[in-house]
UniProtKB/Swiss-Prot annotation:
<keyword id="KW-0704">Schiff base</keyword>
<comment type="function">
    <text>Catalyzes the condensation of (S)-aspartate-beta-semialdehyde [(S)-ASA] and pyruvate to 4-hydroxy-tetrahydrodipicolinate (HTPA).</text>
</comment>
<feature type="binding site">
    <location>
        <position position="208"/>
    </location>
    <ligand>
        <name>pyruvate</name>
    </ligand>
</feature>
<dbReference type="GO" id="GO:0008840">
    <property type="term" value="F:4-hydroxy-tetrahydrodipicolinate synthase activity"/>
</dbReference>
<feature type="site" description="Part of a proton relay during catalysis">
    <location>
        <position position="49"/>
    </location>
</feature>
<keyword id="KW-0456">Lyase</keyword>
<keyword id="KW-0457">Lysine biosynthesis</keyword>
<keyword id="KW-0220">Diaminopimelate biosynthesis</keyword>
<dbReference type="InterPro" id="IPR005263">
    <property type="entry name" value="DapA"/>
</dbReference>
<feature type="binding site">
    <location>
        <position position="50"/>
    </location>
    <ligand>
        <name>pyruvate</name>
    </ligand>
</feature>
<feature type="active site" description="Proton donor/acceptor">
    <location>
        <position position="138"/>
    </location>
</feature>
<dbReference type="InterPro" id="IPR020624">
    <property type="entry name" value="Schiff_base-form_aldolases_CS"/>
</dbReference>
<dbReference type="InterPro" id="IPR002220">
    <property type="entry name" value="DapA-like"/>
</dbReference>
<comment type="subunit">
    <text>Homotetramer; dimer of dimers.</text>
</comment>
<feature type="site" description="Part of a proton relay during catalysis">
    <location>
        <position position="112"/>
    </location>
</feature>
<dbReference type="InterPro" id="IPR020625">
    <property type="entry name" value="Schiff_base-form_aldolases_AS"/>
</dbReference>
<dbReference type="InterPro" id="IPR013785">
    <property type="entry name" value="Aldolase_TIM"/>
</dbReference>
Length: 296
């Protein structure tokens, strides 16, 4: 089991900038990565759910990974979303990430086809055996239906090349069980912003964050405070962020967070169908959460 010791803290699940017609805006992506690094973001997670991975094609997916790795230039780790509900496609995307120079692949639990726990084990083991790139598992049953059980995750933690897990269940009992059972050095990341602070206090390595798209400095400072045991500062940051954690999900992610990024002038407002722009009635809801965090 390899170790990604550098990928610790606030890792942004970065949005994919697009023009009004849905074309990729690579220039905006490069500027966005520079801004995140300036703001203290500890790592870039490219082409995940928040990056609209379901609606980019294979060539675009690889192009986005290459662009992120090139722009980051080794300043922060780049973790590439490489998951698919086809094992062969997941292998191909992971190989693309390896060739681009990403530090790791983030592979979501296969969605729609509802594999068994043994199927999940074989899927991930096959990817790890096929590609020489550290692999982080990603469990988000609210989207995938299939749920990677802790027993299966612990079993996979022993497979060479599988180095971590993003847990988006928000279940602290499950998180505590994982922290207790996985090998030392196996990286555990919260995939749920609202419970990221308790997750880290239990022993997690950080958060792969939607909220960090608009509040990177606060998310970074919260992580630093948590790791240093400065609970007063960690709570202060978390209190400022809490409305964002909920209001950035008033419609399906990444609809609200892309609107918020555009509101801050970071990106153009484009999305790809079937995602549509944030409903007008939700604009002030998200804006109020941004004001609470003193972003505007």
């Amino acid at each position: 089991m390899a170790e990604i010791s550098t990928a610790r803290g606030s890792l942004v699940a970065i949005v994919t900038p697009m023009s009004d017609d849905g074309a990729l805006d690579l220039g905006a992506l490069r500027r966005l990565i520079d801004w995140h690094i300036e703001q203290g973001t500890d790592g870039i997670v490219i082409v995940g759910t928040t990056g609209e991975s379901p609606t980019v094609n294979f060539d675009e997916h690889c192009l986005l990974i290459r662009t992120a790795v090139e722009q980051a230039g080794g300043r922060v780790p780049v973790i590439a979303g490489t998951g698919a509900n086809s094992t062969s496609e997941a292998i191909a995307l992971t190989e693309c990430a390896r060739a681009a120079g990403a530090q790791a692949g983030l592979s979501v639990v296969p969605y729609y086809n509802k594999p068994t726990q043994e199927g999940l084990y074989q899927h991930y083991r096959k990817i790890a055996e096929a590609v020489d790139l550290p692999l982080i598992l990603y469990n988000v049953p609210g989207r995938t239906v299939a749920d990677l059980a802790n027993d299966t995750a612990v079993r996979l933690a022993e497979v060479p090349g599988i180095v971590g897990l993003k847990d988006a269940t928000g279940n602290m009992e499950r998180a505590a069980d994982l922290v207790r059972r996985v090998p030392k050095g196996f990286a555990l990341y919260s995939g749920d912003d609202a419970s990221a602070l308790p997750f880290m206090l239990l022993g997690g390595h950080g958060v792969i964050s939607v909220t960090a798209n608009v509040a990177p400095r606060l998310m970074h400072e919260m992580c630093v405070a948590a790791f240093e045991g400065n609970l007063a500062r960690a709570r202060e940051c978390n209190d400022a962020l809490l409305p964002l954690h909920s209001k950035l999900f008033v419609e399906a992610n990444p609809i609200p967070v892309k609107w918020a990024c555009a509101e801050l002038g970071l990106i153009p407002p484009g999305l790809r169908l079937p995602l549509t722009p944030l409903s007008g009635g939700q604009h002030e809801v998200v804006r109020a959460a941004m004001r609470h965090a003193e972003l505007i």
